[in-house]
């Protein structure tokens, strides 16, 4: 091997900061592997224009960059106040009124964007406003009104979010706006489509169905934000198996289950997603201080590093790159932390699946290659010629410490591989199912500077024709 590669991928959110000062090119050059379009903000034309710039810059820099479209989901929020803001003290009585018009909120009451809240709560429930900064105990309900008492006081301003401790709000995961945004996502051709606040596999299946009807074959990302989706193993597996990618959305999830529980849930989600052959993104406030500071805190460094040690495929930046003052510096700092964490030998070898049966020939070949990589002395890299990206995904579920090069002439496949941990997507124009194509792959990587003469590599590829089988070859770079 002639260069060291970062295995953990970085997802960056686009916004006003990436629209100025050539920052979009700077964050891609600094190491962004996936760019996130937050459909909560901006118009369809904004998103389409940004996608075009991403693809143009990626081509210019010779990089593979995937696009993730993130649907807004239900707006479970208070409405607006006459004066824009109030201050609630502990013990105050406060009414949430679904019939109160916008702009009519006072010290005593405020309207609701989420009109069915009174039907979702019972006396004793705790409502968490503005990520838990203000907390209300439900005393009673009467028609459209929820009568509460303030248990944690503080300022409350327009359009702040509402969560229920322990979850249980019944809002549909997909709104009419989301359905329109799926059409925009299809026009863009996003690689990944994130669904906010899914309650169960049914929400994810519905999103996939709507995407396919729009002509979009994107991988579905489940943003795990509701307490009920992590309440037990069955609920967690239901969400994971219905998705292609899991996002550990620690903001709303942390509010609903409590931050002390979040630590274990993050680790369990990452571990279980990998076991079930799903990719996983860890998100929310990973380098929050770099919105306004040029360096991360030590705590943020440790947070990113711990997600890497947990086995996450990717770590995500939100406001840090969308609205921050130092977007490219944040990406560079995150990349550096990932590389540092990846030096830990304990994360480089996995015994996962040693006692499991394989369900397909493709999986058996992929796992055989990874077993050989972990037990054969001197292997420098794993090379897989892939038309769909499935084999690189399966390989990346096993830790080896070795780079996995996914070679394909299908750009959509390369974009998917941009998210998978340890996988470096490389364009390869040769036919992927022939022996000549397999032998040409290491030479191509040598020419690009990834391999050196004498390197030992494992090469896998699919078969050609109905009578051919998938194969794994051991080759020496000439």
From Swiss-Prot:
Domain of life according to the entry: Bacteria
* Stored CDD domains: Pyruvate_Kinase (cd00288)
| EC top class, as a word | transferase
Q: Catalytic activity annotated for this protein?
A: pyruvate + ATP = phosphoenolpyruvate + ADP + H(+)
The residues listed in the UniProt record as binding ATP, with positions renumbered to this chain, are: 38-41, 77, 160
Could you name the Gene Ontology cellular component terms for this entry?
cytoplasm; cytosol
* Residues annotated as site: Transition state stabilizer: 223
Activity regulation annotation text: Allosterically activated by AMP and by several sugar phosphates. Belongs to type II PK.
Q: Name one GO biological process term.
A: glycolytic process
**InterPro entries, sorted:** Pyr_Knase (IPR001697), Pyrv/PenolPyrv_kinase-like_dom (IPR015813), Pyrv_kinase-like_dom_sf (IPR040442), Pyrv_Knase-like_insert_dom_sf (IPR011037), Pyrv_Knase_AS (IPR018209), Pyrv_Knase_brl (IPR015793), Pyrv_Knase_C (IPR015795), Pyrv_Knase_C_sf (IPR036918)
Annotated pathway: Carbohydrate degradation; glycolysis; pyruvate from D-glyceraldehyde 3-phosphate: step 5/5
Q: Which cofactor does it need?
A: Mg(2+); K(+)
User: Might you give the EC number(s) for this enzyme?
Assistant: 2.7.1.40
Q: Name one GO molecular function term.
A: potassium ion binding
Q: Which residues bind Mg(2+)?
A: 225, 252
The UniProt family comment states: Belongs to the pyruvate kinase family.
Describe its partners and assembly state. Answer: Homotetramer.
Q: What is this protein called?
A: Pyruvate kinase
Source organism per entry reads Haemophilus influenzae (strain ATCC 51907 / DSM 11121 / KW20 / Rd)
């Amino acid at each position: 091997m002639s260069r060291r590669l970062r295995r953990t991928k970085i997802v960056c959110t686009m916004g006003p900061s990436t629209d100025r000062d050539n920052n979009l090119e700077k964050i891609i050059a600094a190491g962004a592997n996936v760019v996130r379009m937050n459909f909560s903000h901006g118009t369809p034309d904004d998103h389409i224009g940004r996608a075009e710039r991403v693809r143009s810059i990626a081509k210019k820099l010779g990089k593979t960059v995937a696009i993730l479209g993130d649907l807004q989901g239900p707006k479970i929020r208070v409405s607006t106040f006459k004066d824009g803001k109030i201050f609630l003290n502990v013990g105050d009585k406060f009414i949430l009124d679904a019939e109160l018009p916008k702009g009519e909120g006072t010290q005593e009451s405020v309207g609701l964007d989420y009109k069915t809240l009174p039907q979702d709560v019972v006396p004793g429930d705790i409502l968490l406003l503005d990520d838990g900064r203000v907390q209300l105990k439900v005393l009673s309900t009467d028609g459209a009104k929820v009568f509460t008492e303030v248990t944690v006081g503080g300022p409350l301003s327009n359009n702040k979010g509402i969560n229920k401790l322990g979850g249980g709000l019944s809002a549909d995961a997909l709104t009419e706006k989301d359905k329109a945004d799926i059409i925009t996502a299809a026009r863009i051709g996003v690689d990944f489509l994130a669904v906010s606040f899914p309650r169960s596999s049914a929400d994810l299946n519905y999103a996939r169905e709507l995407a396919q009807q729009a002509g979009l074959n994107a991988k579905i990302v489940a943003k795990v934000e509701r307490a009920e989706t992590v309440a037990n193993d069955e609920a967690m597996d239901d969400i994971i198996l219905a998705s292609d990618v899991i996002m550990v959305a620690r903001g709303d999830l942390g509010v609903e289950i409590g931050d002390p529980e979040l630590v274990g849930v993050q680790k369990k989600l990452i571990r279980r997603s990998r076991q079930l052959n799903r990719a996983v993104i860890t998100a929310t406030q990973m380098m929050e201080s770099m919105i306004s500071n040029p360096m991360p805190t030590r705590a943020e460094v440790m947070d990113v590093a711990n997600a890497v040690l947990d086995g996450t495929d990717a770590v995500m930046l939100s406001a840090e790159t969308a609205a921050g003052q130092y977007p490219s510096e944040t990406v560079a700092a995150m990349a550096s932390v990932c590389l540092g964490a990846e030096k830990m030998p304990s994360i480089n070898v996995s015994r996962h699946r040693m006692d499991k049966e394989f369900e397909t020939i493709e999986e058996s070949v992929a796992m055989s290659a990874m077993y050989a990589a972990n037990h054969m002395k001197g292997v420098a890299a794993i090379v897989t010629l892939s038309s769909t990206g499935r084999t690189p995904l399966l390989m990346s579920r096993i830790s080896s410490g070795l780079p996995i090069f996914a070679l394909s002439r299908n750009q959509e496949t390369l974009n998917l591989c941009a998210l998978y941990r340890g996988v470096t997507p490389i364009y390869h124009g040769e036919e992927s199912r022939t022996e000549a194509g397999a032998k040409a792959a290491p030479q191509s990587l040598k020419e690009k500077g990834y391999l050196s003469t004498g390197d030992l590599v494992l090469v896998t590829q699919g078969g050609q024709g109905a009578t051919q089988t998938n194969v794994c070859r051991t080759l020496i770079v000439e």
